[in-house]
Amino acid sequence: MKAFYIVYFVATSKKGISSTELSRKLWLRQKTCWYFKRKVMKAMESSGNHLLHGNVDVDEFFVGGQEDGKKGRGKKKKLVVLAIEKTGKGISRMYGKEIAKADSKHLGSFMKETIDTKANIKTDRWLGYRPLKNTFKNLLQIDSGKKGGNFPEIHRAIMLFKSWLRGIHHSVNDLQAYIDEYTYRFNRHLMKTATFENLIRRMIKAKPYYLYA
């Protein structure tokens, strides 16, 4: 029974929930909560069936390390690319991925997996995006502007993700799983009850996911 509570809390908690908090709420060992939460998070991976369309912004950023957010090299830094779908009311959906390099190969792979090729895409002038104009005909590269002023929505999304990551997970270990958890919940923030049901269905259909101590 408590397994269903873990799924419910992970699915519906607005800011997410740590395994420590689950342990306190459910009177279970923290390690037990951590292992089962990882199984829940595995079911939060994108299905790839719902591409972003319309107006889409894409940007890459670093997490971890002493110079969090700055482009450069660092032993503990990890690189993430984020794409957001914009509407008149703000951001409707988003996807993200940890990547090894911000080159056209890695950026292109992510964008082909998540964005409709007919979308109106906006990026900064980073060279890694330039070759992708052959695939994404409506890709526009512009200056970031003073303090990123030409990309306010995606920079705010990045800031909120980093704040959430520090508050719930405290590290960049298992970063892709954290990205999937965050974007899954964000993309369903208007349908909390349905989110729980959807996650249960996903877990039932999913292949067994084994974790070893």
Positions of the model-derived regions?
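Residue-level recognition of single "structural anchor" positions
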Residues: 1-213
